[in-house]
């Protein structure tokens, strides 16, 4: 079983009386790739900055290896940070940028040379030692920034949306590269992003945040397949979300009819939210469908078609490799394991 390295206990943070973190409780394991995911203003970057020591908590505690570090300054914490703006030194070449932290620590030149070359090889920067920062591409600069952080051998690396400035193709490549580096180094990565694909691609654990609160913690598969509430279901991928009534265990009513499902533990006739992913809806002939509807629009998305299908009570988003023409009447089949039931949150 993995060892816990960081724990946040009842952490709150206020700016000018406005609460931006509300009672955050979270533990992070050694050698884990964990992602804080959420929309702008959800508190994910504030959480990262608190772990790094760049922000103080209003309430609660930060524990590192079981010891309280609330008052420990950033430079004394066993963490390094890669910011969205890489903050590289333009007057230094690549080698000296990476070596900077080691020189501050007064590491001897022989050790600096060996460590920097080792990290440059890991980051696929071999041969770039004397290159000026201004001559590098965005992806190369990002590699230098990460190399500068990991050469100091931190126990935890904090990454604040480091891929945000890269183009789509390079961003996808760097997602896999970061995961490879983390596995090779065996250190804890805490990654912040608003990009769901990044979180699902790289992470061992995803922490979904909204309005200063943790909404759900789980593996990428759990977060996607078993969202805890409507926010998570809507934020992670696409979803069809309907009002329903849980009649009894394994039986739910929505869209004017009853459906078998796999959920239990709700009160009889409890109002619930019903979530069905677009890729889980099966297109069939109209006479074979559990529901029928008319195709309103069709958009080719590369690996599938996205169709909007208007039934009697709802406009369904459907993802399918099978294309239907606009105006066609089609049937939809919904299987029990494709239906996700969740408790309604007050205000829904």
Curated annotation (Swiss-Prot):
Tell me what topology the record assigns in the membrane.
Answer: Peripheral membrane protein
Chain segments annotated as coiled-coil in the UniProt record: none
Q: What is its main location?
A: membrane
Location of the ABC transporter domain: 6-236
The record's annotation in PROSITE patterns points to:
ABC_TRANSPORTER_1, ABC_TRANSPORTER_2, POTA
Which reaction(s) does its UniProt entry say it catalyses?
Answer: ATP + H2O + polyamine-[polyamine-binding protein]Side 1 = ADP + phosphate + polyamineSide 2 + [polyamine-binding protein]Side 1
User: Where is the protein situated, by its record's location annotation?
Assistant: Cell membrane
Q: Where does ATP bind?
A: 38-45
Q: Does the keyword Cell membrane apply?
A: yes
Which Pfam families does this one have? Answer: ABC_tran (PF00005), TOBE_2 (PF08402)
Q: Kindly list the GO CC terms recorded for this protein.
A: ATP-binding cassette (ABC) transporter complex
Oligomer status and interactors? The complex is composed of two ATP-binding proteins (PotA), two transmembrane proteins (PotB and PotC) and a solute-binding protein (PotD).
> What the protein does?
Part of the ABC transporter complex PotABCD involved in spermidine/putrescine import. Responsible for energy coupling to the transport system.
Q: Which family does it belong to?
A: Belongs to the ABC transporter superfamily. Spermidine/putrescine importer (TC 3.A.1.11.1) family.
Q: What is this protein called?
A: Spermidine/putrescine import ATP-binding protein PotA
What organism is this sequence from?
Desulfitobacterium hafniense (strain Y51)
